[in-house]
Amino acid sequence: MTKQGDERHLNSNRRLRFPSLSERVGLTADLLRIHAPLSCFKEIPNYRKEEIGLPGLTYLYANENRQKAYLLITSEILGKRYPEKLNCENIEYALERINSITDVELDVELLLNYGCVSEVHVTDDLLLSHDPQIYLYALRSIPIPDKINRTPYHKESVRFSTYNKDKRHRFYLTLYDKYREIKRHRCRQCEDELFRDVVRIELKLESAEMIKKYLKI
């Protein structure tokens, strides 16, 4: 791609940049799916999940035909800073960890300015004064409108979603006992006790349309 063409391609991706997304809504997230022009990646081997070797970097691949690369990261990529969740203060640190631990070489500055977020799990934690299971049991039992679907999430938790078949207009709201989830997955990134009596609330948005609608950007 020529330099002029590359600049046009970069400019066409100035939609949901990390600074504008994070700073304007002050969000914290447990997961981000990002796509960006290939020029944001100095070196990008195509990894299968089991080959990556970095907790929190779930997948990473390049599409030469579309001149784009795609990556999905979760809060685990923060290492000992896992309890912070992904946010505007640590996203640069998260991307730099990819450079330092894997064979991937990102142009972090370009990626922060031109990377587009195509999926986000907006996350918050609610610290309770009693057993979270009492709260979650109530949510599993109360009447809800017909247009909302309620399903179990790992038995003890609950997920609400819309019935809309078009994922561009669908949302998932999941509430679960974070302490139990940490114990179940044996997360090495943090101490279990940090999440005792915590209900985690995650809003899963899978499209640019939903991100713009719910995050008011």
Provide a role label for each language-model segment.
Residues M1-I217:
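Structured, helix-rich domain cores that form ligand/interaction pockets
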